[in-house]
């Protein structure tokens, strides 16, 4: 099943995000084709990264939570809130 992982950054934490970005991207890259989509959420003006959204194939929400917990961003204390929801892809057809 696919899950959407929404990670909201703590306020004024851009430096934490930027200093851990390379480690985060390497970690996410290790998930390979389990990742359908990933990228940063942006501020309302589109200028700053304020979180992350990923769509990931996994057996359970617990698996997604484990992925989120091991992310270098999470280990650095970047996230204020993490939300995991089952996701059904309709377009393009899955």
Where are these regions (language model features)?
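Conserved, structured core segments of small domains
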Residues: 1-94
